Design a protein with these regions (language model features):
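N-terminal subdomain of nucleotide-sugar transferases
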Residues: 2-90
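Nucleotide-activated donor-binding/catalytic signature segment of Leloir-type glycosyltransferases, i.e.
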Residues: 289-314
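Carbohydrate-associated surface elements
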Residues: 196, 218
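Short alpha-helical donor nucleotide-sugar binding micro-motif in glycosyltransferases
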Residues: 318-323
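Conserved donor-binding/catalytic core segment of Leloir-type glycosyltransferases
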Residues: 242-258, 264-270, 276
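Conserved acidic donor-binding segment of nucleotide-sugar-dependent glycosyltransferases
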Residues: 363-364, 368-375, 384-389
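Short hydrophobic beta-strand element within catalytic cores of glycosyltransferases
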Residues: 348-352, 361
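Aromatic "clamp/platform" in nucleotide-sugar-dependent glycosyltransferases that forms part
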Residues: 331
């Protein structure tokens, strides 16, 4: 069957996976050149992309598919099992740690290594799924050379990032803009994570609408869920948060695009709140992290700010459950996994009304979306939840219901639809 096609926003069309047609197992190569799915989210360049790659790979393998994941090694090449049916191959390219802005220069060499691995495989791959523009840059020549269909997921787009830069932030380079436009026109299919991303792809990047599919992420509710009261109390005690303090949590890599400065700026308007920042500074954003500490001191709220770095998934789940409110002040997000994880934990979210956050947060149901970046307005939205226990419970219960409607098996089903349709179209 052909996939159904439904109208999207701004005159764009989006393809939505049609049913869950069974078939023979697929051999899938997933490529994340610049960051390994085994890396801890919130550390270095690891974030929601890493979660999506790992969770979808495991779910695809759980459905009987063979999944190989390829990334760049910063040391010797190696391979190891990530989960049953999922093998991670770290390919040696360039040697050592390389700054992200230098990675495009290694794309050809990485692609050569990937092609050798594909040719050495016992059976050919049915599809290659490239995550992020750097992976697409490396993979497209391999796809053309070996005749393997390529599916692209961008995760972030330079077109949108450059529209919403923080003051003093460096714009994405022209090379990335041009590469994303070229990839959008040449790949067999694009798996977009939100309708907001589809709008940018079709209206700003020039992606052919008939090749764009909507496959949003999910959340693992066996990890992210409400915990016993004793667990919440233990987390708050470790953070030095008193019983009558409001615990506000902001999770993400520390960088200007994530907007943690706004979370700090709203604290003077929330005298009874403690802010916890969970995440490490991305390479090149160390000064931004320092500026957050400077800002907190200038505003007289440093004693109410805790920066705890990145956390393993179980510890993050405990933190989100212990929070009274989770804030997501990002300048742009293609989707935003943290709001889903908070919702599954039963914790209300206050987020910026931008991009995919308008889909991962249901305004007035699982949280509140805020226009603009006025600290007083953000504090008002957060304070309204902190001051109303009944509202906290109402938003939290709705969040749990919303999060339970979709899991990573649904994502795997839909990706299979994309892969099979793409392979069938290439075979015509």
């Amino acid at each position: 069957m052909r996939p159904t096609i439904a109208p999207g926003y701004a005159g764009c069309m989006r393809q939505e996976p049609y049913g869950h047609t069974p078939g023979t197992p697929l051999r899938i190569a997933i490529v994340s050149m610049h960051t390994s799915p085994a890396d801890r989210p919130g550390k270095g360049d690891a974030g929601g992309l890493n979660v999506l790659v790992l969770e979808s790979a495991m779910a695809l393998a759980g459905r009987g598919n063979h999944v190989d994941v390829f990334t760049r090694s910063v040391g010797a090449p190696h391979a190891h099992s990530l989960a049953p049916g999922v093998t991670l191959y770290a390919l040696e390219t360039g040697g050592g740690i390389v700054r992200k802005h230098e990675l495009p220069n290694l794309a050809d060499a990485f692609g050569d290594q990937l092609q050798r691995a594909a040719l050495a495989a016992t059976d050919p791959y049915d599809v290659i799924h490239a995550h992020y523009w750097l992976s697409g840059l490396a993979v497209l020549p391999v796809s053309l050379s070996l005749g393997i269909p390529i599916v692209q997921t961008f995760h972030t787009l330079a077109e949108e990032k450059n529209r919403r830069l923080a003051d003093g932030d460096r714009p994405e380079p022209e090379r990335r803009l041009l590469t994303e436009r070229y990839l959008a026109s040449e790949v067999d299919a694009i798996a977009a994570v939100s309708r907001a991303e589809i709008d940018v792809l079709c209206d700003g990047v020039g992606a052919p609408a008939e090749r764009v599919w909507l496959v949003p992420p999910a959340v693992d509710t066996t990890v992210f869920h409400p915990a016993p009261v004793s667990s919440r109390e233990a987390v708050r005690a470790r953070l030095g948060v008193r019983a009558d303090d409001g615990l506000v949590v902001c999770v993400g890599r520390v960088q200007a695009a994530k907007g943690q400065d706004l979370a700090v700026r709203m604290l003077p308007h929330l005298p009874g709140a403690v802010l916890v920042l969970a995440g490490d500074a991305t390479p090149g954003s160390e000064r931004y992290l320092e500026s957050l500490h400077d800002l907190a001191r200038e505003l007289g709220v440093a004693y109410r700010v805790r920066h705890i770095g990145s956390l393993e998934r179980p510890a993050l789940a405990q933190l989100l459950d212990a929070a009274d409110v989770v804030v997501v002040p990002s300048r742009t997000e293609s989707f935003g996994l943290v709001p889903l994880e908070a919702a599954a934990s039963g914790t209300p979210v206050v987020a910026a009304r931008v991009g995919g956050l308008m889909e991962s947060v249901i305004d007035g149901e699982t949280g509140v979306l805020v226009d603009g970046r006025d600290p007083a307005e953000w504090a008002e939205a957060v304070g309204a939840i902190l001051d109303d226990v009944d509202l906290q419970l109402e938003l939290g219960l709705a969040g749990r219901r919303a999060a339970s409607r979709r899991d990573w098996q649904d994502v795997a089903h839909e990706l299979e639809d994309v892969y099979r349709a793409t392979a069938a179209a290439r075979a015509l």
